[in-house]
Curated annotation (Swiss-Prot):
EC number assigned by the record: 7.1.1.-
GO biological process: photosynthesis, light reaction
Keyword Cell division set for record: no
Keywords: Chloroplast, Membrane, NAD, NADP, Plastid, Plastoquinone, Quinone, Thylakoid, Translocase, Transmembrane, Transmembrane helix, Transport
Functional description taken from the UniProt entry: NDH shuttles electrons from NAD(P)H:plastoquinone, via FMN and iron-sulfur (Fe-S) centers, to quinones in the photosynthetic chain and possibly in a chloroplast respiratory chain. The immediate electron acceptor for the enzyme in this species is believed to be plastoquinone. Couples the redox reaction to proton translocation, and thus conserves the redox energy in a proton gradient.
UniProt organism field: Lemna minor (Common duckweed)
UniProt protein name: NAD(P)H-quinone oxidoreductase subunit 3, chloroplastic
Reaction equations catalysed: a plastoquinone + NADH + (n+1) H(+)(in) = a plastoquinol + NAD(+) + n H(+)(out); a plastoquinone + NADPH + (n+1) H(+)(in) = a plastoquinol + NADP(+) + n H(+)(out)
Principal subcellular localization: plastid
A GO molecular-function annotation: quinone binding
Pfam families noted in UniProt: Oxidored_q4
Length: 120
């Protein structure tokens, strides 16, 4: 039988974790001084006066490199718990992890062939 009271701790945690940030924003909005001026509107660069335009156009190469890094980072996050409990899980989970790794290898070969890993 499905009982809703089993999830009371989850709902309490969800409400508390939602109310605390909202309260922090409300309190900071009420208590913060409202002072606007040229110093508040300028960009902050480690206490140094900004030189030139604050907007710099990045090349798309940085984004592609970061995206490939995130893919391999997520792969590590998923494979670490599997590796820690490898002896308990069995052969079926090994095959699933192998399929997961093969899909990521195909993706990395595709990124390599497309030149996403080239930094020239």
């Amino acid at each position: 039988m499905f009982l809703l009271y089993e999830y009371d701790i989850f709902w309490a945690f969800l409400v508390i974790s939602s109310v605390i940030p909202i309260l922090a924003f409300i309190i900071s909005g009420v208590l913060a001084p409202l002072s606007e001026g040229p110093e508040k509107l300028s960009s902050y660069e480690s206490g140094i006066e900004p030189i030139g335009d604050a907007w710099v156009q990045f090349r798309i190469r940085y984004y592609m490199f970061a995206l490939v890094f995130v893919v391999f980072d997520v792969e590590t996050v998923f494979l670490y718990p599997w590796a820690m409990s490898f002896d308990v899980l069995g052969v079926s989970v090994f095959i699933e992890a192998l399929i997961f790794v093969l899909i990521l290898i195909v993706g990395s070969v595709y990124a390599w062939r497309k030149g996403a890993l080239e930094w020239s």
